[in-house]
């Protein structure tokens, strides 16, 4: 039995029983009730629920023929597209496990994920296949090849039977694996069942007031679990999922995606929201912010005239654990209360319930808890612990987040216990950044930190103790980091220090680190080509400068991934063609100009 007394002492909501349904079953219910309604809008194409279902059924049969099936992983190396949505549904229909990969991540990172997960199949398209690492030894399904298209067209498009799958679907079966940042220097795969999906879907649809007339933005990166929130919020309500045809969504590209797609509902990280004006997206009636702490100023700007909700949840608890009610401009920003199907505990160091107002560690339990970390039994045992407030055999997840409970029951977030941070909606283990930089031969020690620039907001920065007799440059370190880390984990500043400051207990004293040093910019070399002139003008505007040199480094001037999106967009408007990772690999004006294509 649930320990109601302990639960009351912690002022937690007990786990509420919810229906058992798989992702495929949730989807197929809507297909039966709204077959002709628009399910996906992308690049000028509209697909009905019936059309998407038929394509997913054909692909599911192809995947089964190629070796997919219950318990087997299928890697999806696909950009944001209808291909990705249909592939997720197809894997679910086949009873297999989908592993989404972000093809914009470094090849070394993708290679590690594939080697660690060992999927039975890899699905991709021609545009994404070129970005994958070499030497992938697994069957590959190229979805847009003429040969595969012909095979798919010949397959039946009816819903699959249990006989075809080799058994019935079960919500408690492994459904998907998501890789998140890991403190050891390697990302870790979180293995989740579908047991928490029905409660998540019901909570999102109810809180966001999604109806069949709603248009929900598909914003999240394919490798980020918020992707599932968007699919579930749209598809369980019979709404339309708006899928932009671009990998870069912040600032003007995000504003245009919302405006052109007539998006009414979106789930966005606060950093992306902050790149727009509320007045620029009048159709956006419902906005959920999630992925990082929500500033009070953002609530003040965005709450008037629309439904604004703050949500919280780690990957290990099926995307979302708590949500607020509708926020007003003057509200204190909390992370709300647990959604149905989730229990929340705030405990002290002895795992006893914290008193109201007392800060403790946040623990989560419920049907949506992950099975654990792929191939990491020790880490799983460390983070998923027995739940003393519930029936024998139940577990709870140690989030590592600090929280307290207000008198009204809402939960306040107080940061992290460990070295994990949230940056622009992404989870970053500082230890992973430090581990990667420490592998550079000229680095004796590296410390990563989150530093708030008064003008530019939170920045990921690093401090490096050079190996004896070496002087690694910021450019060398950035290039090294970019080989192993995704864009959002590449530091924006590299500061050389003689030694890492320590606390009296011998631990790294992050508070004792100096302010990061931005490299002195060279002066005197002006633009020599039309492309360099265009980029110099953009750099001046982005960094509010009068003079600039073509050897100026974007990141050493304070640039970050959000500003990089702005840079790429402005360059494209001026006729320069640049790709998302271009700025990481070629951060100076002269380097960017040398590889950019200038349209006449």
UniProtKB/Swiss-Prot annotation:
Top EC class of this enzyme: ligase
Keyword Nucleus included in the entry's annotation: no
Superkingdom of source: Bacteria
GO biological process, alphabetically ordered: amino acid activation for nonribosomal peptide biosynthetic process; novobiocin biosynthetic process
S-S bridge residues: none
Listed pathway(s): Antibiotic biosynthesis; novobiocin biosynthesis
Assigned EC number: 6.-.-.-
MF terms (GO), sorted A to Z: ligase activity; phosphopantetheine binding
Boundaries of every Carrier domain copy: 526-600
Cellular-component GO terms for this entry: cytoplasm
InterPro entries: AA_adenyl_dom (IPR010071), ACP-like_sf (IPR036736), AMP-bd_C (IPR025110), AMP-bd_C_sf (IPR045851), AMP-binding (IPR020459), AMP-binding_CS (IPR020845), AMP-dep_synth/lig_dom (IPR000873), ANL_N_sf (IPR042099)
Keyword set, alphabetical order: Antibiotic biosynthesis, Ligase, Phosphopantetheine, Phosphoprotein
Modification O-(pantetheine 4'-phosphoryl)serine occurs at: 561
Spans annotated as Disordered: 505-526
Family statement drawn from the similarity comment of this UniProt entry: Belongs to the ATP-dependent AMP-binding enzyme family.
Record NCBIfam families: AA-adenyl-dom (TIGR01733)
Function of the molecule: Together with NovI, involved in the formation of a beta-OH-Tyr intermediate in the novobiocin biosynthesis pathway, an aminocoumarin family antibiotic that targets bacterial DNA gyrases. The ATP-dependent AMP-binding region activates L-Tyr as L-tyrosyl-AMP and then transfers the L-tyrosyl group to the acyl carrier domain through thioester formation to form a tyrosyl-S intermediate that is covalently tethered to NovH (L-Tyr-S-NovH).
Name this protein carries in UniProt: Novobiocin biosynthesis protein H
Organism whose genome encodes this protein: Streptomyces niveus
């Amino acid at each position: 039995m649930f320990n109601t007394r302990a639960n009351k002492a912690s002022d937690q909501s007990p786990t509420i029983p919810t229906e058992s349904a798989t992702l495929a079953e949730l989807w197929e219910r809507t297909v039966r009730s709204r077959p002709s309604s628009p399910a996906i809008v992308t690049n000028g194409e509209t697909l009905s629920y019936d059309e998407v279902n038929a394509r997913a059924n054909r692909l599911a049969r192809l995947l089964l023929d190629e070796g997919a099936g219950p318990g087997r992983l299928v890697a999806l190396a696909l950009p944001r597209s209808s291909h990705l949505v249909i592939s997720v549904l197809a894997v679910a229909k086949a009873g297999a496990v989908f592993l989404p990969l972000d093809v914009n991540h470094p090849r070394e990172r993708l290679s590690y994920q594939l080697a660690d997960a060992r999927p039975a199949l890899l699905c991709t398209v021609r545009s994404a296949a070129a970005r994958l690492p070499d030497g992938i030894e697994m069957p590959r399904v190229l979805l847009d090849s003429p040969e595969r298209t012909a095979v798919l067209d010949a397959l039946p498009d009816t819903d699959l039977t249990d006989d075809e799958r080799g058994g019935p679907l079960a919500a408690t079966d492994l459904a998907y694996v998501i890789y998140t940042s890991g403190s050891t220097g390697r990302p870790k795969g979180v293995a989740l069942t579908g047991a928490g999906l029905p409660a998540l879907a019901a909570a999102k649809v109810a809180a966001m007031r999604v109806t069949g007339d709603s248009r929900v933005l598909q914003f999240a990166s394919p490798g980020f679990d918020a992707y599932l929130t968007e699919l579930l919020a749209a598809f369980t309500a019979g709404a339309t999922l708006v899928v932009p045809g671009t990998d870069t969504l912040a600032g003007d590209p995000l504003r245009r995606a919302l405006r052109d797609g007539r998006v009414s509902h979106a789930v966005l990280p606060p950093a992306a929201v902050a790149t727009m004006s509320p007045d620029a997206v009048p159709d956006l009636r419902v906005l959920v912010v999630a992925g990082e702490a929500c500033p009070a100023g953002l609530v003040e700007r965005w709450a008037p005239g629309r439904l604004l909700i703050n949500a919280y949840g780690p990957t290990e608890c099926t995307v979302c654990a708590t949500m607020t009610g509708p926020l007003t401009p003057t509200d204190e920003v909390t992370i709300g209360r647990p959604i149905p199907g989730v229990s929340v505990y705030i405990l002290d160091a002895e795992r006893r319930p914290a008193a109201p107002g007392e800060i403790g560690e946040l623990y989560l339990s419920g049907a949506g808890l992950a099975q654990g970390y792929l191939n990491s039994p020790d880490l799983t045992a460390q983070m998923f612990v027995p739940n003393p407030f519930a029936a024998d055999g139940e577990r709870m997840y140690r989030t590592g987040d600090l929280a307290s409970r207000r008198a009204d029951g809402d939960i306040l977030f107080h940061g992290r216990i460990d070295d994990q941070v949230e940056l622009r909606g992404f989870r970053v283990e500082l230890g992973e950044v430090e581990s990667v930089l420490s592998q550079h031969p000229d680095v004796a020690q590296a410390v990563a930190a989150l530093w708030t620039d008064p003008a530019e907001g939170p920045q990921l920065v690093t401090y490096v103790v050079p190996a004896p007799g070496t002087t690694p440059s910021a450019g060398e370190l950035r290039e090294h980091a970019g080989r192993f880390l995704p864009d959002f984990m590449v530091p924006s500043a590299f500061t050389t220090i003689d030694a890492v400051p320590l606390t009296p207990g011998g631990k790294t004293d992050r508070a004792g680190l100096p302010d990061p040093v931005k490299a002195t910019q060279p002066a005197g070399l002006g633009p020599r080509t039309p492309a360099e002139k265009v980029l110099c003008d953009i750099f001046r505007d982005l960094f509010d400068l009068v003079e600039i040199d073509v050897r100026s480094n974007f990141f050493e001037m304070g640039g970050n991934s959000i500003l990089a999106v702005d840079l790429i967009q402005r360059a494209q408007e001026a006729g320069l063609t640049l790709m998302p990772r271009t700025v990481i690999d070629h951060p100076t004006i002269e380097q960017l100009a040398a590889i950019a294509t200038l349209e006449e």
